[in-house]
Amino acid sequence: MTPTTADAPGFTERYRVIQSRDRRFDGQFVTAVRSTGIYCRPSCPARTPKEENVTFYATSAAAHEAGYRACKRCLPEAAPGSPLWDVRGDVVARAMRLIADGVVDREGVPGLARRLGYSSRHLTRLLSAELGAGPLALARAHRAHTARALLVGTDLSSADVAFSAGFSSIRQFSETIGEVFGMTPSALRSRRSAATRTEVAAGEIDLALPVRGPIDTVGLFGWMRAHAIPGVEEGDDRSFARVVRLPGGPAWFEVRRADDDKLRLRARLTALADLGTLIARVRRLFDLDADPLAIDDALARHPELAPAVAAIPGVRVPGAMDADEMLLRAMIGQQISVASARTMQGRLAAELGEPASVAPEPMTLFPPPAVIAERGLEVLRGPAARMRAIVEAAGALADGSLEIGPGDDGAEQRERLLAMRGIGPWTADYVRMRVLGDPDVLLPGDVAARAGAAQLGLPSDPAGFTAWSQRLAPWRSYAMAHYWYAAPVTQAWRSPAETAAAAAVARPSRRAAVVDVVANDVVAAVDDHAPDPDAAAPARGASGAPTPRGSHAAAARHQAAAPASPVAAASVSAGAVPAAAAPATLRPVPTTLPDAESETPA
């Protein structure tokens, strides 16, 4: 989005937004007013400026570069981030995700350009043309946002605020605050209200996390609690805490839900300069920059999903604190239950992890890839081929032959992962959903999601499930969240009232009940909900077809006899093609027979 003036396309729509003071658009663009020299968020309560005095910018950094300062009344820097950087997968969006993660502060513009595969000059041209500001200005705006939050929400000294926000000197910090906000750091701090202050222990930081509502905190904390690695993570229905490695050393954080459904972050850091990176990763973990009203509106247009959306407004799809850890957790969770995956992950942490002295109570850091590559086979349990695949992936992450992160191109990341032994479409796409925040990922091989679809009266066979869900693009990741929450196996994640509301929209059938048996026997959802079709080769009968075993055989016989869903039949007859099909040149890598808890791959 280049600067938008009164005669440019899109100006009228944005001007209507600021006339209505629509909070849904906060963080998606800023309004610069030439007559006052300030820029505001779309919902600013001040009088709407005249059209001829208005210019719209995609980012606050672009407004800074054009000579504007932030409005003291609406504080545009305190708005949630733009959801566009997750919806879009182009180089600009990838750059914005990496800038938020602190890459420019740690590696400079050359480091950012290298990660994206561009020269520094070309990347600067791209960002300036699209956003009105280059990478240095965008990183500076991000530092200013972090500094404002610390000045208003903590009692840290100005020096600590400066270095926590990523500034290299107190002078640079003071000059930036003055240019962006039009006041000194002490004056900005004096404007805070008593409500923004909280009592914290020595060495801790406590901040509010801006959220674009509504937000399904019940589902988020239930999800986190269900998948918490013992010793590394812990959670209940109102909070989630864990320890994590950051560039400057280990850190501990806790996100908690206040009575008004707002979220607060409490943290302890080895290096204060990691705070901006921590905030960015926590926001991604809790999907706080999503546009829930737009997502809910799009999904609710389909009558089959409307009741589920009404029962759980503001659903979120959790991201990942650490990309390498996310991949290894997903691989460990292949074809086993969530409980079994947590047990194995907890054993890894207990035997190979390091104590995290930064935490307020004893906790352990999840072992890095290099340690798992060296000693993982001593601890991991399960089919030998799968364990070797996990260790090989850890080795590739450790030596740099495999790199994944939030700045990846989605298609390229998927191709790299599928080239690894033991990684199939489910794992590759699940990692893309969690690490990149891709809003349009469907997992046809996910048993729990298909069980949830059956509960909602939707096709639950992989082909029908894929074909029907195509109409939900580009929000299929959020549809997956609704499918997961509709599955019987996840009902314990929600409070009794929430469970009753979710159950009221389900339409169980005899066929769905059989699928539920499979889902409960195999998986529970999320990190590890489903078998990856390429993680293990199924047993084969004389005909060469997969041979179902145990309860799966009963389910297979029942599904073979059951009539096809009318919705599925209509979708397939319409010529729908599964969007998540793997490239033809990438072949499944057979490993071993399924273990006792795995389902025969479809």
Regions found by a protein language model. Name each.
Residues 1-602:
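HhH-family (HhH-GPD) DNA N-glycosylase catalytic core used in base-excision repair
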